[in-house]
Curated annotation (Swiss-Prot):
GO terms for cellular component: cytosol. Mn(2+) 1 binds at residues 399, 403, 459. Monomer. Keywords: Glycolysis, Isomerase, Manganese, Metal-binding. This is 2,3-bisphosphoglycerate-independent phosphoglycerate mutase. It comes from Francisella tularensis subsp. holarctica (strain LVS). Belongs to the BPG-independent phosphoglycerate mutase family. It comes from the Bacteria.
Length: 512
């Protein structure tokens, strides 16, 4: 029987002393409260420069899992792209130049698609604005922006400012206009809800939508009148001088999101020759370019390809002949696998994976427990089996229910997780294992913005907990730790040497 070391990542579980609409603090959590009092604990950083993001930028699930799994600060795509813009090399990028050259050669159209948002989680609107300026400088005559609206990593009704900025820039440059708008709920699905993606695709490619208006602002106003906030804006086309924009052969499409997980599905709809998730009129002959690599299987150009880190936690465990398990429900499965392994799709030798389907509900406040019962059943069985040296799991609830802005549902989610943690604690202690509990970023710790008194659906920049549960004596060895210090801590408790590529430090010292 192996003594399992378990890492539990509570997605969106930040720490705050404030009890103002703090679903984590105000929920009834007897297990969490007793663990917090009884076992060694500290708070660590999960945002900003400490995870390779710009200063004051909130963390997110992708960034969090990359930093945890790699055991070092990994500079994120947002930071890399910002640097390229600052150093004025963005416009020299080979993939971007090729997309623009294709348009000029064929006298065709350039389409920019992506999340028009200052959120900085999946995209940043400043990248879109810079791309528009570069297109003008390089001689593009017709540029059309297909704007996905946020309302999740930003306040629910905050898109007006971004739309006005984009409209003004396009008008000032006499370059084109916003040709369609669409809530990210449709264009950025990641759970195989292809009916949503189909609506977004048809609006962008075929100018086929339920609603057509004369401007993006009018589309937004009418959406609010239907009580649809930014995230849920039904795909809408914009008609200018009687003209609707379609994507045609020989056009170039540049996808301006830098985060992969919610950009994959619609990218496959654009690029796969044998695509069969919904009917398309035809397979387009276009130049399709993505800002970063969304999926190695996509047939497209990539402006900023990934740099593969070596000696991640998964790789070190493999080299030491350890068995490992990754488990999560659909919403967070890529995070404990692809992102945790530093952007590697393939499993390591000795690495098993369990995917639990997320419930098919419109929004997760309708089912706050999500698939946590099934995840916990599988986890307890895996611990009891004695098969695994290391298990990494993710509970999605505090993040996904937190994003709905429903405070009562978020508290229900937290209370359910507390029961799950109780089962894990009992199993780990019974088998003399080690359990670490942490989070990748905050969310449910602030469900209402205290300044605006409106629902807060974005992540927070609060510190996150890091707790050791086990029979070993542990002392906090590192003040002001961060997510990249977690992997070295796991290696420490497992008695495995830390590779030089891991620059993180152990958070706890354990008595031998």
């Amino acid at each position: 029987m192996k003594k399992t070391t378990l890492l539990v990542i509570l997605d969106g579980w930040g720490y705050s002393d404030s009890d103002y609409f703090n679903a984590i603090k105000n929920a009834n959590t007897p297990t969490w409260d007793s663990i917090w009092q009884e076992f060694p604990k500290t708070l660590i950083n999960a945002s900003s420069l400490e995870v390779g993001l710009p200063r004051s930028q909130m963390g997110n699930s992708e960034v969090g899992h990359v930093n945890i799994g790699c055991g070092r600060v990994v500079y994120q795509e947002l930071t890399k792209i910002d640097k390229a813009i600052e150093e004025k090399t963005f416009g020299d990028n080979k993939a971007i130049c090729a997309a623009i050259d294709n348009v000029i050669k064929n006298d065709s159209n350039l389409h920019l698609i992506g999340l028009l948002s200052p959120g900085g989680v999946h995209s940043h609107e400043e990248h879109i604005f810079e791309m528009i300026k570069i297109a003008k400088q390089k001689g593009i005559k017709r540029l059309y922006l297909h704007a996905f609206l946020d309302g999740r990593d930003t306040p629910p009704r905050s898109a007006e400012k971004s739309i006005k900025k984009a409209d003004k820039l396009l008008q000032d440059l006499n370059l084109g206009y916003i040709a369609s708008v669409c809530g990210r709920y449709y264009a950025m699905d990641r759970d195989n809800r292809w009916d949503r993606v189909e609506k977004a695709y048809n609006a962008i490619v075929n100018a086929n939508a339920d609603f057509i208006y004369d401007s993006a602002l009018e589309a937004l106003e009418q959406s609010y009148a239907r009580d649809q906030s930014d995230e849920f804006v039904i795909p809408t086309c914009i008609k200018k001088d009687g003209h609707l924009v379609k994507v045609q052969d020989n056009d170039s499409v540049i996808f301006m999101n830098f985060r992969a997980d919610r950009a994959r599905e619609i990218s496959h709809a654009f690029t796969d020759e044998s695509f069969d998730h919904f009917p398309r009129k035809k397979h387009l002959n276009i130049n399709f370019t993505t800002l970063t690599e969304y999926d190695s299987k996509l047939k497209c150009a990539v402006a900023f390809p990934p740099e593969q880190p070596i000696n991640t936690l998964g790789e070190v465990l493999m080299k030491n002949h350890k068995t490992q398990l990754r488990i999560a429900e659909t919403e967070k499965y890529p995070h404990v696998t692809f992102f945790f392994n530093g952007g590697r799709e393939e499993q390591f030798e000795g690495e098993d994976r369990i995917l639990i389907p997320s419930p098919k509900v419109a929004t997760y406040d309708l089912q706050p427990e999500m698939s946590a019962p099934e995840v916990t059943d599988k986890l307890v069985a895996a611990i009891n089996s004695g098969k695994y040296d290391c298990i990494v799991c993710n509970y999605a609830n505090s993040d996904m229910v937190g994003h709905t802005g429903n405070y009562e549902a978020a508290m229900q989610a937290i209370e359910y997780l507390d029961k799950c943690i109780a089962r894990l604690k009992d199993a780990i202690l019974e088998h003399d294992g080690n359990m670490f509990i942490t989070a990748d970023h905050g969310n449910a710790d602030m469900m209402v913005n205290p300044e605006t008194q409106k629902p807060h659906t974005a992540h927070t920049t609060n510190l996150v907990p890091f707790i050791y549960v086990g029979h070993k004596k542990a002392q906090v060895a590192l003040e002001h730790g961060k997510l990249s210090d977690i992997a070295p801590t796991l290696l420490n408790v497992m008695g495995i040497a830390q590779p030089k590529e891991m620059t993180g430090k152990t958070i706890f010292n354990f008595e031998k």
